[in-house]
Amino acid sequence: MTHQTHAYHMVNPSPWPLTGALSALLLTSGLIMWFHFNSFLLVIIGLTCMLLTMYQWWRDIVREGTFQGHHTPVVQKGLRYGMVLFIVSEVFFFLGFFWAFYHSSLAPTPELGGCWPPTGIHPLNPLEVPLLNTSILLASGVSITWAHHSLMEGNRKQMIQALSITILLGIYFTILQASEYYESSFTISDGVYGSTFFVATGFHGLHVIIGTTFLIVCLLRQFNFHFTSTHHFGFEAAAWYWHFVDVVWLFLYVSIYWWGS
């Protein structure tokens, strides 16, 4: 092995970006096949490919950062910038959905009956399951902060407890959201209200599932003593992402559930 005179990580060639792109192609193509031909085969293949890619890519990053020491302070600084820019891009992603919602609701067209919610739509009560979901995500924001402080103080037991609570709250939120979708009186095909509601809240739900997976990986790493009080960017990135998911939900609740109803 040649001697390295700089602090940067020269990444080895990896197949995972290619397999990740392939799984994205299979998933999007699979959704089209599912919607038009009621065939779920491509979706299953795409999901399997994506899960395998996630596992192996995460495994490589954990190996490089924890066991090989490639994640120097300089590399961690670059990773932090990358995570911040990723969250900024996600903000603009959700901004498009809010724009579509307000564009449709502030000046309803005659086709919608000139009112919002459109004629025939019975919106969900914001003081029932949506309010419970809000309290769940706010509580999870508190518990993830508790986990972060416990990690920085070297309190392993409390960190595991707090992170486990956050994961359980995330799973509970997902179950409640799924039951709410199942019991709602309108669908994604019910005009602009249905499409904006289900796309905005559905993508948020997907982000909750991704964030919960991220936190589960962090919990498994904590069990294996991968984090220290000074070297834990993987957990820090997951916590930032989770706080972002919390804030997006507050805007969704106020805009779509409360004001929009």
Swiss-Prot record:
Q: Which segments cross the bilayer?
A: 16-34, 41-66, 73-105, 129-152, 156-183, 191-223, 233-256
Which GO molecular function entries does the Swiss-Prot or TrEMBL record give?
cytochrome-c oxidase activity
Identify the keywords attached in UniProt to this record, alphabetized: Membrane, Mitochondrion, Mitochondrion inner membrane, Translocase, Transmembrane, Transmembrane helix
InterPro entries in alphabetical order? Cyt_c/ubiquinol_Oxase_su3, Cyt_c_oxase_su3_dom, Cyt_c_oxidase-like_su3, Cyt_c_oxidase_su3-like_sf, Cyt_c_oxidase_su3_a-hlx
| EC number from the UniProt entry | 7.1.1.9
Highest taxon, organism lineage: Eukaryota
Q: Which residues lie on this side of the membrane: Mitochondrial matrix?
A: 1-15, 67-72, 153-155, 224-232
Catalytic reaction equation(s): 4 Fe(II)-[cytochrome c] + O2 + 8 H(+)(in) = 4 Fe(III)-[cytochrome c] + 2 H2O + 4 H(+)(out)
Subcellular location(s) per record:
Mitochondrion inner membrane
Q: How does it sit in the membrane?
A: Multi-pass membrane protein
Q: Which GO terms describe its biological process?
A: mitochondrial electron transport, cytochrome c to oxygen; respiratory chain complex IV assembly
Transmembrane as UniProt keyword: yes
Q: Which Pfam families match?
A: COX3 (PF00510)
Mind telling me which GO cellular component terms the entry cites?
A: mitochondrial inner membrane; respiratory chain complex IV
Q: What class of enzyme is it?
A: translocase
Please list the residue ranges that the record places on the Mitochondrial intermembrane side of the membrane: 35-40, 106-128, 184-190, 257-261
Subunit structure, as described in the record: Component of the cytochrome c oxidase (complex IV, CIV), a multisubunit enzyme composed of 14 subunits. The complex is composed of a catalytic core of 3 subunits MT-CO1, MT-CO2 and MT-CO3, encoded in the mitochondrial DNA, and 11 supernumerary subunits COX4I, COX5A, COX5B, COX6A, COX6B, COX6C, COX7A, COX7B, COX7C, COX8 and NDUFA4, which are encoded in the nuclear genome.
Q: Which family does it belong to?
A: Belongs to the cytochrome c oxidase subunit 3 family.
Annotated function: Component of the cytochrome c oxidase, the last enzyme in the mitochondrial electron transport chain which drives oxidative phosphorylation. The respiratory chain contains 3 multisubunit complexes succinate dehydrogenase (complex II, CII), ubiquinol-cytochrome c oxidoreductase (cytochrome b-c1 complex, complex III, CIII) and cytochrome c oxidase (complex IV, CIV), that cooperate to transfer electrons derived from NADH and succinate to molecular oxygen, creating an electrochemical gradient over the inner membrane that drives transmembrane transport and the ATP synthase.
User: What name is this protein filed under?
Assistant: Cytochrome c oxidase subunit 3
Per the UniProt entry, what species is this protein from, by scientific name? Osphranter robustus
Q: Which gene encodes it?
A: MT-CO3
